[in-house]
Amino acid sequence: MASSSHNPVILLKRILSLTESSPFILCLDSIAQTSYKLIQEFVHQSKSKGNEYPIVYISFETVNKPSYCTQFIDATQMDFVHLVKQIISYLPAATATQAKKHMVIIDSLNYISTEYITRFLSEIASPHCTMVATYHKDIKDENRTVIPDWNNNYPDKLTLLQFMATTIVDIDVVLTGTLDTEEVSELLNEFRIPRGLNNDIFQLRLVNKRKSGRSLEYDFIVNSNTHEYELLSTTKQEEESSSNGLETPEMLQGLTTFNLGTSNKQKLAKDQVALPFLEAQSFGQGGAIVYEYEKDDDYDEEDPYEDPF
């Protein structure tokens, strides 16, 4: 769990308004609670901050063009190559130094084959684009079972998406009335949708991957009518317990003859450390070992392959 120095509600608002840097936001929904209300929150928060981002909407399921989108692409009758070319034509070049941020909304990633999903996302990704894509958890990934010579050890589509995503938003329904989770699950398995689902008030779990390599996880109740976000009490208790478990000067006294404690300045510097994994696993390239040489490092001057400068 994240440290208590972060405000979870502010973090959620920054992600929804695209103020927080997160190139790929993955929304996981279901029949019980779709991502429609959450997408509306992205649009509302971005406008409330005074940011009128151009929105490119890629439709696999949506029939009518949403009023808020700038460009609408009907992807149902397009092949992979032409779809990527048309999307890129609406986005600024990745090498552009000054370009307005764009939002790309994909209403369903389930229609893209597992074989092409990583290539599709990597070709769209750029420093000037934030992708907000939905994946339906209720639909099983059947493509991987019919691809010839498919490696059984290769991960499924959902695992790939969760690995690539910089932010994961798992949406869940808030049940009202006499319905319980087990009853709703049984009805949905029989394709019987009870009343009281897809409410304006829903629950979501936020997983935000930081540049330092760790993840922040929070549970919220979202009211899409009032645009209010409430941190769940269970998450608050975990935050308090984790903060109680942090080191204090009193806990470390008498253990050694030297100081084991860290000052607030040192803790802040620790939180701002960025490990090289994000640079090594960026879009469009394979893994790499990233190391920055310093002048004091020892290296062999006669080795032609070891020239750090």
From Swiss-Prot:
A biological process from GO: tRNA wobble uridine modification
One Gene Ontology cellular component annotation held by this UniProt entry: elongator holoenzyme complex
Main location: cytoplasm
Residue numbers bearing the Phosphoserine modification: 3-4
Localization (cell): Cytoplasm; Nucleus
CDD domains: Elp456
Keyword entries, A-Z: Cytoplasm, Nucleus, Phosphoprotein, tRNA processing
InterPro entries: Elp5, P-loop_NTPase
Pathway assigned in UniProt: tRNA modification; 5-methoxycarbonylmethyl-2-thiouridine-tRNA biosynthesis
Presence of keyword Nucleotidyltransferase: no
UniProt-recorded Gene Ontology molecular function terms: identical protein binding
Family from the record: Belongs to the ELP5 family.
Stated role: Component of the elongator complex which is required for multiple tRNA modifications, including mcm5U (5-methoxycarbonylmethyl uridine), mcm5s2U (5-methoxycarbonylmethyl-2-thiouridine), and ncm5U (5-carbamoylmethyl uridine). The elongator complex catalyzes formation of carboxymethyluridine in the wobble base at position 34 in tRNAs. It functions as a gamma-toxin target (TOT); disruption of the complex confers resistance to Kluyveromyces lactis toxin zymocin (pGKL1 killer toxin). May also be involved in sensitivity to Pichia inositovora toxin.
Further comment found in the protein's record: Present with 3870 molecules/cell in log phase SD medium.
Subunit record text: Component of the elongator complex, which consists of ELP1/IKI3, ELP2, ELP3, ELP4, ELP5/IKI1 and ELP6. The elongator complex is composed of two copies of the Elp123 subcomplex (composed of ELP1/IKI3, ELP2 and ELP3) and two copies of the Elp456 subcomplex (composed of ELP4, ELP5/IKI1 and ELP6). The Elp123 subcomplex forms a two-lobed scaffold, which binds the Elp456 subcomplex asymmetrically. In each lobe, ELP2 is tightly sandwiched between ELP1/IKI3 and ELP3. The Elp123 subcomplex binds tRNA through ELP1/IKI3 and ELP3 and can bind 2 tRNAs simultaneously.
The protein, known as: Elongator complex protein 5
Organism of provenance: Saccharomyces cerevisiae (strain ATCC 204508 / S288c) (Baker's yeast)
Taxonomic lineage: Eukaryota, Fungi, Dikarya, Ascomycota, Saccharomycotina
